[in-house]
Design a protein with these regions (language model features):
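Extreme N-terminal basic, low-complexity initiation segments
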Residues: 2-9
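Short terminal hydrophobic/aromatic SLiMs and anchors at protein ends
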Residues: 14-16, 25-26, 34, 40, ...
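Class I (Rossmann-like) S-adenosyl-L-methionine-dependent methyltransferase catalytic domain
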Residues: 30, 41, 50-96, 111-159, ...
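Conserved class I S-adenosyl-L-methionine
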Residues: 101-108
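A short glycine-rich, Lys/Arg-flanked "PGG" loop and its adjoining helix->strand segment in the class I
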Residues: 183-195
Length: 257
């Protein structure tokens, strides 16, 4: 074990696990199937002699109340997977604010951290998320937003297909899709953009495969092998106009018109 390199992510992961009350943690374990926090939780759980697999939608529901705090820990410590999270959201927010009263679709909006700020500034918000609990939390902040539950690996839910959007955003959500699914979904989403509209993705993302491998090595056991992160040079083969801004060593913003 590389003590210096693994101590920080292991400590971070353990602190994340400790945020969850024991009763919820036990429920969490019983329904675990798939989540962006998988590697963090597994590391922390190993210290307790526990095993956690990926979360299903029930797992997302259980984790919803601690979502923002969990992300904040990783961002503040500048560690994978959420290093640069605030910078990512800040760039997306500034971009969308360039269009007055923009119509925005958020794919996997979570607790509404980004979309709430847009909503408060006059944007019309539409969204799709896997978790009913996430939707409930976001709806409290945005009572007039049009939010729907659905698995975006199967595409947009029917009500959202009736509209056209200035911006379609996805923050830390599309890495659950395979590369082939990403390409298909992005191609489909372009059909729902208004003229001059943009798809904006903020996520764990890298310009090259080499950069991804470097981040993977640095993250050590914290790296989640079940997530499929963006490699821009490979995605540009299908989307030559794709632009990319690196925001940290593991996060970036992709834009596609």
């Amino acid at each position: 074990m590389r003590s210096a390199e693994k101590a920080v992510p292991l400590t971070s992961a353990y602190s994340v696990v400790c945020l969850l009350p024991q009763a919820q943690f036990n429920n969490f374990r019983s329904c675990a199937q798939g989540n962006v926090f998988h590697s963090l939780l597994c590391l922390g759980a190993q210290r307790k002699g526990m095993v956690i697999s990926m979360l299903n939608n029930k797992g997302f529901d259980l984790w919803a109340d601690g979502y923002d705090k969990t992300v904040g820990i990783s961002d503040e410590e500048n560690t994978y997977p959420f290093a640069g999270y605030k910078k990512v959201l800040g760039l997306i927010f500034q971009t969308i604010m360039g269009v007055e009263n923009a119509v925005v679709l958020d794919i996997g909006f979570g607790t509404g951290t980004l979309t709430t700020k847009l909503y408060e500034r006059g944007c019309s918000i539409y969204g799709q998320d896997f978790s009913s609990r996430m939707i409930a939390l976001a709806s409290e902040k945005m009572p007039n937003a049009q939010l729907y539950q659905g698995d975006f690996s199967k595409g947009l839910v029917e009500p959202l297909r009736s509209f056209r959007y200035d911006y379609i955003v996805a923050t830390y959500s599309l890495h659950h899709l395979t590369d082939a699914q990403k390409k298909s979904f992005l191609s489909d989403l372009r059909g729902y953009l208004k003229e001059n509209g943009k798809i904006i993705i903020g996520d764990v993302a890298f310009e090259t495969r080499e950069a991804l491998e470097q981040c993977k090595w640095k993250a050590g056991d914290a790296w989640d092998p079940d997530e499929i992160y963006f490699v821009v040079e490979e995605l540009r083969k299908d989307f030559p106009a794709l632009s990319f801004t690196q925001m940290s060593d593991c996060a970036g913003v992709l834009m596609l018109g």
